[in-house]
Curated annotation (Swiss-Prot):
The protein's name: E3 ubiquitin-protein ligase ATL23
Organism in which the protein naturally occurs: Arabidopsis thaliana
Keyword Transferase (UniProt): yes
Record has Zinc as a keyword: yes
GO cellular component: membrane
Metabolic or biological pathway, per its Swiss-Prot or TrEMBL entry: Protein modification; protein ubiquitination
Similarity-based family: Belongs to the RING-type zinc finger family. ATL subfamily.
Membrane topology: Single-pass membrane protein
PANTHER family: E3 UBIQUITIN-PROTEIN LIGASE ATL42, RING-H2 FINGER PROTEIN ATL43
Matching PROSITE patterns: ZF_RING_2
Subcellular location: Membrane
InterPro entries reported for this sequence: Znf_RING, Znf_RING/FYVE/PHD
Amino acid sequence: MHYTRISPALVPSLSPTAAAESSGGGTMIATVFMALLLPCVGMCIVFLIYLFLLWCSTRRRIERLRFAEPVKPVTGKGLSVLELEKIPKLTGRELAVIARSTECAVCLEDIESGQSTRLVPGCNHGFHQLCADTWLSNHTVCPVCRAELAPNLPQCNENQSPC
C-alpha cells in the first residue's frame, strides 16, 4: 500500500459560516433552549395539577359540609343554683351501679366510692358533684352526649333514692 500525500493546497477550504454550521453551532442554541424550556414547562404542568387537586378537595369538603347534619349548638346560660339542687346526688358507689361508669368525663379522673356525685337525669351520665355543678351552671346539656336536661327536673328528698 502506498499512501500519497495530499497537499493542503489541493483540499478545498470551507468558508467560516459553513464551518460553524457543520460543527453544530445552530443545534447548540436549540439544545440550550430545550434544556431551559422543558423543566419550566414540566414544573408548570405539575403546579397546574396541584391546583386542580386542591380545587377538587376544597369543593368536596364544601359539599360535605353543606349536606352534613348540623352540630347541636350549646346555648343558654346554664342552670341556677336551685335547679342544680334538683339534680340527684349520689355517692360514687351508687353511681357505679346506676351509670356503670367510674370516670368523670369533665375532669377525666376516676370517681371514688365515697365521693359526692351527680347523675344527669334522662341520659344517666354521672360526674363529680363539683364538676357537674361547674359544667351545668354554664350549660344546659350533658357534657357527654349533649342531651338537653329535662325542663322539669325531678324533686328529690334526702330520704328518696333517685332511682
